[in-house]
Every structure is written in structure tokens, then in C-alpha cells.
């Protein structure tokens, strides 16, 4: 089981044999056309066709790592731009009251859209972009609130997130951190438990438990331990995401799946940032 339903869905298709059937179905008509064309081509023309390089992934509409990287950067840019706008809206003391509506709207909206994306049978690019917009609204608003409470914490969280992302990629690439079917299953169960706890924690925080910090309070050892666990889970989620992208490229899935993979990476990256932000804020106290 992957870190989120997006990669779970892709992994199931890879295990089912990818799109080998797609290759066979599309190959037959091409072969038929080629035989028909050969009747009218001379030897020189046939030699030219034979000497041409084989079609690559781009020409055949296959998924490439470049596709995933570029779409991930595009969605990341949307999150950053919208997040910056949301930040400046609530940074003004006169508009500080908008912080909670923006955070709730962004959080609940992105949760709803994320579930639709994960379980929708077709890939919807507009929904994926809309999710990035809502994530930007939420991240910008909550970052501005944390920055007012703990000056400099956002910059530290951004640097820590980027460093963790790079470190996890290198550790996965070098084989230091491995992703196996067993680790995916264990991680999937851990994620479900942590998700249920997080939802209960959000409700508890709105009820004033732990001084609006939820279970564990602001700076108790329990609260810090919960945040460390969240950072650890989000970090390993990235390793699973990297592995899923690598398997999807190897399985030669259609190019349209690059949007779904990019979306999954953004989900994990934003999750990691939020967990690090909460951990740093707790350590400040």
C-alpha cells in the first residue's frame, strides 16, 4: 500500500501488468499499415525507414521522469504563489480575522478534492490544479499565523523540508532506505492510524484541548513525540513516492499519469512541511 490513495492506485495497475495490453493492441494496426505501405515503397525508401531511430517514450506517449518533474514543479509553483498571496492577506493585522476561514476553507477543500482525485476513475487536470490552489491557501494562512507566533520558524521549516526531501531522495537512490511490498503494507497501516489520530486531534484543538494544540499540548514530551512521528512518516512517504514514480516510468504507463504522480508528490511534500512546522514551533517553547 502506498502512502496515499494516488500511489496505491498506480501501484495496483503496475502489479496488474501495467499497460502491456495497450502495446499489443496498438501494435497490430501499425503492422498492418506497414505491410500495406511496403507494397508502394522502393528499396531506398525502405532502407531510410529502417535506419531511423526507434520512437522514444515522448513519441509514443509514454510516461517519462521529465514529465513528472516538470508537472511537479508546476504544481509546486502554484502552491507557492497562492500561498504567498494567502500569507500577505492575513499578515495585515486588520485582516488577521481571515486566518481561520482561509485555513479551514483550504484544509477542508483540499481534503475533499484530494479524495475525489484519488478515487476518480479518470485523471482530471483541473481538479489537480484546484487542489494545489487550495493547498496554497491553507499553507499560506497557517504559515503566516505560525510566523507571527514564532518569528523565523517558517524559514527554518522551509529549509528543513527541502533538506529532508533531498536527503530522502539520495537515501532512496543509494539504497540506504529501501521500499518493499512489506514496508508498504506496514506503512499503509501506520498511515491509517495516524490519519484517524490527526482528525481527532483537529477536533480536539478546536475544542480547546491542549491550548488549541490538541492532544499532547504545545511543548510536552508527548506533543513533541507526536510531531517527530509525523515527520518520520511524512519523510518515508517521500521514499515510497520516489519508488512509485520509478516503477511507473519502468512500466511505461501513459503520459497522463504524470499529473497523478506529481499530485502525489505535492501531497507528501506539503504534509512534510506542516509536520516540520509544528515540530519546530513546539521546540521553540
Predicted regions and their residues:
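A hydrophobic alpha-helical transmembrane-helix feature that marks the membrane cores
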Residues: 1-285
Amino acid at each position: 500500500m502506498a502512502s496515499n490513495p494516488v500511489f496505491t492506485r498506480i501501484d495496483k495497475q503496475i502489479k496488474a501488468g501495467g499497460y502491456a495490453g495497450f502495446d499489443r493492441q496498438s501494435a497490430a494496426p501499425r503492422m498492418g499499415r506497414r505491410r500495406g505501405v511496403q507494397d508502394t515503397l522502393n528499396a531506398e525508401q525502405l532502407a531510410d525507414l529502417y535506419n531511423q531511430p526507434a520512437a522514444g517514450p515522448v513519441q509514443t506517449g509514454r510516461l517519462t521522469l521529465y514529465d513528472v518533474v516538470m508537472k511537479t514543479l508546476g504544481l509546486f509553483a502554484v502552491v507557492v504563489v497562492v500561498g504567498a498571496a494567502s500569507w500577505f492577506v492575513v499578515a495585515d493585522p486588520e485582516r488577521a480575522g481571515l486566518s481561520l476561514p482561509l485555513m479551514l476553507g483550504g484544509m477542508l477543500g483540499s481534503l475533499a478534492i484530494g479524495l475525489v482525485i484519488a478515487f476518480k476513475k479518470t485523471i482530471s487536470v483541473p481538479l489537480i490544479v484546484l487542489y494545489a490552489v487550495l493547498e496554497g491557501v491553507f499553507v499560506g494562512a497557517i504559515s503566516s499565523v505560525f510566523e507571527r507566533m514564532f518569528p523565523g520558524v517558517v524559514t527554518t521549516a522551509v529549509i528543513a523540508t527541502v533538506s529532508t526531501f533531498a536527503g530522502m531522495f539520495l537515501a532512496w537512490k543509494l539504497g540506504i532506505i529501501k521500499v518493499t511490498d512489506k514496508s508498504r503494507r506496514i506503512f499503509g497501516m501506520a498511515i491509517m492510524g495516524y490519519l484517524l489520530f490527526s482528525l481527532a486531534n483537529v477536533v480536539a484543538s478546536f475544542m480547546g484541548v491542549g491550548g488549541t494544540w490538541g492532544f499532547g499540548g504545545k511543548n510536552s514530551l508527548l506533543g513533541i513525540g507526536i510531531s517527530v512521528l509525523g515527520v518520520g512518516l511524512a519523510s518515508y512517504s517521500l521514499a515510497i513516492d520516489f519508488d512509485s514514480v520509478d516503477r511507473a516510468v519502468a512500466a511505461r504507463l501513459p503520459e497522463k499519469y504524470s499529473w497523478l504522480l506529481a499530485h502525489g508528490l505535492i501531497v507528501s511534500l506539503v504534509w512534510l512541511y506542516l509536520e516540520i512546522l509544528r515540530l519546530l514551533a513546539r521546540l521553540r517553547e
